[in-house]
Amino acid sequence: MQDPNADTEWNDILRKKGILPPKESLKELEEEAEEEQRILQQSVVKTYEDMTLEELEDHEDEFNEEDERAIEMYRRRRLAEWKATKLKNKFGEVLEISGKDYVQEVTKAGEGLWVILHLYKQGIPLCALINQHLSGLARKFPDVKFIKAISTTCIPNYPDRNLPTIFVYLEGDIKAQFIGPLVFGGMNLTRDELEWKLSESGAIMTDLEENPKKPIEDVLLSSVRRSVLMKRDSDSEGD
Protein backbone atom coordinates (compact mmCIF):
# COMPACT_ATOMS: atom_id res chain seq x y z
CA MET A 1 0.00 0.00 0.00
CA GLN A 2 1.34 3.40 -0.98
CA ASP A 3 2.24 5.82 1.82
CA PRO A 4 -0.26 8.75 1.62
CA ASN A 5 2.39 11.03 3.15
CA ALA A 6 5.03 10.12 0.58
CA ASP A 7 6.23 12.99 -1.60
CA THR A 8 5.13 11.56 -4.99
CA GLU A 9 3.53 13.05 -8.11
CA TRP A 10 0.54 10.72 -7.70
CA ASN A 11 -0.06 11.83 -4.13
CA ASP A 12 0.20 15.47 -5.22
CA ILE A 13 -2.57 14.84 -7.76
CA LEU A 14 -4.74 13.15 -5.13
CA ARG A 15 -4.21 16.09 -2.75
CA LYS A 16 -5.23 18.56 -5.47
CA LYS A 17 -8.40 16.54 -6.04
CA GLY A 18 -9.12 16.59 -2.32
CA ILE A 19 -8.84 12.82 -2.05
CA LEU A 20 -5.87 13.11 0.31
CA PRO A 21 -5.59 15.82 2.97
CA PRO A 22 -2.93 18.50 2.41
CA LYS A 23 0.52 17.38 3.44
CA GLU A 24 1.74 19.14 6.57
CA SER A 25 4.74 21.29 5.99
CA LEU A 26 7.98 20.60 7.79
CA LYS A 27 7.57 23.87 9.67
CA GLU A 28 4.14 22.83 10.91
CA LEU A 29 5.49 19.48 12.03
CA GLU A 30 8.30 21.21 13.89
CA GLU A 31 5.85 23.59 15.54
CA GLU A 32 3.69 20.68 16.66
CA ALA A 33 6.72 18.90 18.06
CA GLU A 34 7.77 22.05 19.93
CA GLU A 35 4.25 22.48 21.34
CA GLU A 36 4.23 18.88 22.53
CA GLN A 37 7.63 19.41 24.14
CA ARG A 38 6.40 22.61 25.81
CA ILE A 39 3.33 20.86 27.21
CA LEU A 40 5.49 17.99 28.40
CA GLN A 41 7.94 20.43 29.96
CA GLN A 42 5.13 22.24 31.77
CA SER A 43 3.91 18.92 33.09
CA VAL A 44 7.41 18.05 34.31
CA VAL A 45 7.90 21.46 35.94
CA LYS A 46 4.50 21.29 37.59
CA THR A 47 5.33 17.85 38.94
CA TYR A 48 8.63 18.99 40.43
CA GLU A 49 7.16 22.26 41.65
CA ASP A 50 5.08 20.25 44.11
CA MET A 51 8.09 18.34 45.44
CA THR A 52 10.00 18.99 48.63
CA LEU A 53 13.72 19.81 48.60
CA GLU A 54 14.50 16.19 49.53
CA GLU A 55 12.35 14.83 46.68
CA LEU A 56 14.05 17.14 44.19
CA GLU A 57 17.41 15.74 45.27
CA ASP A 58 16.13 12.16 44.84
CA HIS A 59 14.91 12.80 41.26
CA GLU A 60 17.75 14.93 39.92
CA ASP A 61 19.14 12.02 37.83
CA GLU A 62 15.94 12.13 35.75
CA PHE A 63 16.46 15.74 34.63
CA ASN A 64 17.72 16.89 31.26
CA GLU A 65 19.53 20.20 30.90
CA GLU A 66 16.33 22.26 30.57
CA ASP A 67 14.74 20.42 33.46
CA GLU A 68 17.74 21.15 35.65
CA ARG A 69 17.50 24.89 34.99
CA ALA A 70 13.79 24.93 35.83
CA ILE A 71 14.24 22.73 38.87
CA GLU A 72 17.13 24.82 40.15
CA MET A 73 14.86 27.85 40.05
CA TYR A 74 12.24 26.05 42.15
CA ARG A 75 14.89 24.68 44.48
CA ARG A 76 16.18 28.20 45.17
CA ARG A 77 12.65 29.46 45.71
CA ARG A 78 11.79 26.66 48.11
CA LEU A 79 15.04 27.18 49.98
CA ALA A 80 14.27 30.90 50.33
CA GLU A 81 10.77 30.08 51.62
CA TRP A 82 12.23 27.61 54.11
CA LYS A 83 14.75 30.17 55.36
CA ALA A 84 12.02 32.80 55.68
CA THR A 85 9.91 30.39 57.73
CA LYS A 86 12.86 29.58 59.97
CA LEU A 87 13.55 33.29 60.44
CA LYS A 88 9.92 33.99 61.25
CA ASN A 89 9.81 31.25 63.87
CA LYS A 90 13.29 31.45 65.31
CA PHE A 91 12.29 32.95 68.67
CA GLY A 92 9.47 31.54 70.79
CA GLU A 93 11.20 32.21 74.10
CA VAL A 94 12.46 35.13 76.18
CA LEU A 95 16.18 35.69 75.61
CA GLU A 96 18.37 36.92 78.48
CA ILE A 97 20.89 39.62 77.51
CA SER A 98 23.28 42.01 79.22
CA GLY A 99 24.32 45.55 78.39
CA LYS A 100 27.08 44.46 76.01
CA ASP A 101 24.51 42.58 73.90
CA TYR A 102 22.15 45.55 73.58
CA VAL A 103 23.37 46.95 70.26
CA GLN A 104 23.42 43.58 68.53
CA GLU A 105 20.16 42.26 69.97
CA VAL A 106 18.11 45.47 69.89
CA THR A 107 19.57 48.19 67.67
CA LYS A 108 20.68 45.73 64.98
CA ALA A 109 17.90 43.21 65.51
CA GLY A 110 16.82 43.29 61.87
CA GLU A 111 14.60 45.01 59.36
CA GLY A 112 10.91 44.94 60.23
CA LEU A 113 11.55 43.08 63.50
CA TRP A 114 9.75 44.07 66.70
CA VAL A 115 11.72 43.75 69.94
CA ILE A 116 10.19 43.78 73.42
CA LEU A 117 12.75 44.39 76.19
CA HIS A 118 11.92 43.87 79.86
CA LEU A 119 14.24 45.53 82.37
CA TYR A 120 13.93 43.78 85.72
CA LYS A 121 15.66 42.81 88.95
CA GLN A 122 15.59 39.67 91.00
CA GLY A 123 13.48 39.89 94.15
CA ILE A 124 10.80 42.19 92.71
CA PRO A 125 7.57 40.13 92.55
CA LEU A 126 5.97 42.11 89.71
CA CYS A 127 9.11 41.66 87.59
CA ALA A 128 8.90 37.91 88.15
CA LEU A 129 5.21 37.92 87.19
CA ILE A 130 5.89 39.85 83.98
CA ASN A 131 8.73 37.49 83.06
CA GLN A 132 6.28 34.63 83.46
CA HIS A 133 3.68 36.34 81.25
CA LEU A 134 6.30 37.22 78.62
CA SER A 135 7.36 33.57 78.39
CA GLY A 136 3.81 32.66 77.38
CA LEU A 137 3.55 35.56 74.94
CA ALA A 138 6.90 34.66 73.35
CA ARG A 139 5.51 31.21 72.52
CA LYS A 140 2.30 32.73 71.18
CA PHE A 141 4.11 35.32 69.02
CA PRO A 142 7.34 33.63 67.80
CA ASP A 143 7.90 36.29 65.14
CA VAL A 144 8.48 38.92 67.87
CA LYS A 145 11.79 39.05 69.73
CA PHE A 146 11.21 39.01 73.48
CA ILE A 147 14.27 39.76 75.60
CA LYS A 148 14.94 40.56 79.25
CA ALA A 149 17.89 42.09 81.07
CA ILE A 150 18.78 43.05 84.61
CA SER A 151 18.18 46.78 84.56
CA THR A 152 21.56 48.02 85.75
CA THR A 153 23.45 45.95 83.16
CA CYS A 154 21.78 48.01 80.42
CA ILE A 155 21.33 51.35 82.19
CA PRO A 156 23.80 52.03 85.05
CA ASN A 157 22.12 53.28 88.25
CA TYR A 158 18.64 52.70 86.82
CA PRO A 159 16.31 53.24 89.83
CA ASP A 160 14.43 50.25 91.17
CA ARG A 161 11.30 52.39 91.56
CA ASN A 162 11.02 52.36 87.74
CA LEU A 163 10.83 48.58 87.64
CA PRO A 164 9.41 46.75 85.93
CA THR A 165 10.12 48.60 82.68
CA ILE A 166 9.24 47.44 79.18
CA PHE A 167 10.58 49.11 76.05
CA VAL A 168 9.12 48.28 72.63
CA TYR A 169 11.39 48.74 69.61
CA LEU A 170 11.04 48.54 65.85
CA GLU A 171 14.28 48.60 63.87
CA GLY A 172 16.10 50.14 66.84
CA ASP A 173 13.59 52.93 67.47
CA ILE A 174 11.51 53.05 70.67
CA LYS A 175 7.82 52.81 69.79
CA ALA A 176 6.41 52.49 73.32
CA GLN A 177 7.56 52.37 76.93
CA PHE A 178 5.91 51.17 80.12
CA ILE A 179 7.69 52.30 83.28
CA GLY A 180 6.91 51.43 86.88
CA PRO A 181 4.43 49.20 88.72
CA LEU A 182 1.45 51.57 88.42
CA VAL A 183 1.46 51.32 84.62
CA PHE A 184 0.98 47.57 84.89
CA GLY A 185 -1.66 47.69 87.60
CA GLY A 186 0.36 45.83 90.21
CA MET A 187 0.29 42.12 90.96
CA ASN A 188 -3.24 41.75 89.57
CA LEU A 189 -1.83 42.02 86.03
CA THR A 190 -2.96 39.10 83.84
CA ARG A 191 -1.25 37.80 80.74
CA ASP A 192 -4.17 38.91 78.57
CA GLU A 193 -3.92 42.44 79.98
CA LEU A 194 -0.21 42.55 79.18
CA GLU A 195 -0.88 41.18 75.69
CA TRP A 196 -3.48 43.89 75.07
CA LYS A 197 -1.12 46.59 76.32
CA LEU A 198 1.68 45.40 74.01
CA SER A 199 -0.72 45.10 71.08
CA GLU A 200 -1.60 48.79 71.42
CA SER A 201 2.05 49.57 70.65
CA GLY A 202 1.77 47.63 67.37
CA ALA A 203 4.33 45.00 68.35
CA ILE A 204 1.92 42.06 68.33
CA MET A 205 -1.34 41.22 66.56
CA THR A 206 -3.61 40.09 69.36
CA ASP A 207 -6.64 37.88 68.85
CA LEU A 208 -8.32 39.44 71.88
CA GLU A 209 -11.47 41.27 70.84
CA GLU A 210 -11.51 43.82 73.65
CA ASN A 211 -9.42 45.12 76.51
CA PRO A 212 -9.62 42.46 79.23
CA LYS A 213 -9.00 45.09 81.91
CA LYS A 214 -12.13 47.02 82.69
CA PRO A 215 -11.76 50.81 82.92
CA ILE A 216 -11.57 52.09 86.49
CA GLU A 217 -14.98 53.75 86.09
CA ASP A 218 -16.60 50.36 85.38
CA VAL A 219 -14.89 48.84 88.40
CA LEU A 220 -16.10 51.66 90.66
CA LEU A 221 -19.66 51.44 89.33
CA SER A 222 -19.69 47.68 89.88
CA SER A 223 -18.47 48.22 93.42
CA VAL A 224 -21.18 50.82 94.06
CA ARG A 225 -23.88 48.51 92.64
CA ARG A 226 -22.72 45.67 94.88
CA SER A 227 -22.81 47.99 97.92
CA VAL A 228 -26.34 49.16 97.08
CA LEU A 229 -27.57 45.58 96.61
CA MET A 230 -25.99 44.50 99.89
CA LYS A 231 -27.63 47.45 101.69
CA ARG A 232 -31.03 46.60 100.21
CA ASP A 233 -30.67 42.98 101.30
CA SER A 234 -29.68 44.12 104.78
CA ASP A 235 -32.67 46.51 105.01
CA SER A 236 -35.02 43.76 103.85
CA GLU A 237 -33.79 41.40 106.52
CA GLY A 238 -34.28 44.15 109.15
CA ASP A 239 -37.92 44.60 108.13
From Swiss-Prot:
Acts as a chaperone for the angiogenic VEGF receptor KDR/VEGFR2, increasing its abundance by inhibiting its ubiquitination and degradation. Inhibits the folding activity of the chaperonin-containing T-complex (CCT) which leads to inhibition of cytoskeletal actin folding. Acts as a chaperone during heat shock alongside HSP90 and HSP40/70 chaperone complexes. Modulates the activation of caspases during apoptosis. It comes from Homo sapiens (Human). Keywords: Acetylation, Angiogenesis, Apoptosis, Chaperone, Cytoplasm, Endoplasmic reticulum, Phosphoprotein. NCBIfam families: phd_fam (TIGR01552). Residues 91-239 are annotated as: Thioredoxin fold. N-terminal methionine acetylation destabilizes the protein. One of its GO terms (biological process) is angiogenesis. Residues 97-99, 153-155 are annotated as: Interaction with XIAP. This is Phosducin-like protein 3. Residues 32-180 form the Phosducin domain. Pfam families: Phosducin (PF02114). It is found in: Cytoplasm; Cytoplasm, Perinuclear region; Endoplasmic reticulum. GO terms for cellular component: cytoplasm; cytosol; endoplasmic reticulum; nucleoplasm; perinuclear region of cytoplasm; perinucleolar compartment; protein-containing complex. InterPro entries: Phosducin-like_chap/apop_reg, Phosducin_thioredoxin-like_dom, Thioredoxin-like_sf. SUPFAM superfamilies: Thioredoxin-like. The modification N-acetylmethionine is found at M1.
